[in-house]
């Protein structure tokens, strides 16, 4: 499976940076699943779940405080007040 570079940052610093298979967060219009090769876009993220699938198939589940996500051709940047992973 192709991967995409995911960077999650808050005002306090970097929360996560690395290659992932995918990311699921909740946007203003519903859940967003971002995979490698996704069409570029920018949208707000509302508080709720944050699910990251790592290249080894493991999953990081967390809760996000919301923020802004930018999906580019090569990477995904998520700016948030915070994410708490289980």
Language-model-detected regions and their locations in the chain:
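Intrinsically disordered, compositionally biased charged tails
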Residues: 1-3
């Amino acid at each position: 499976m192709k991967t995409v570079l995911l960077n999650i940052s808050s005002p306090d610093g970097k929360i996560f940076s690395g290659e992932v298979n995918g990311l699921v967060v909740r946007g203003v219009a519903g859940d967003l699943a971002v995979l490698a090769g996704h069409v570029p876009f920018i949208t707000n993220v509302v508080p709720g779940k944050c699910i990251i699938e790592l290249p080894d198939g493991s999953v990081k589940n967390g809760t996000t405080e919301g923020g802004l996500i930018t999906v580019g051709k090569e990477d995904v940047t998520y700016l948030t007040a915070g994410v708490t992973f289980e």
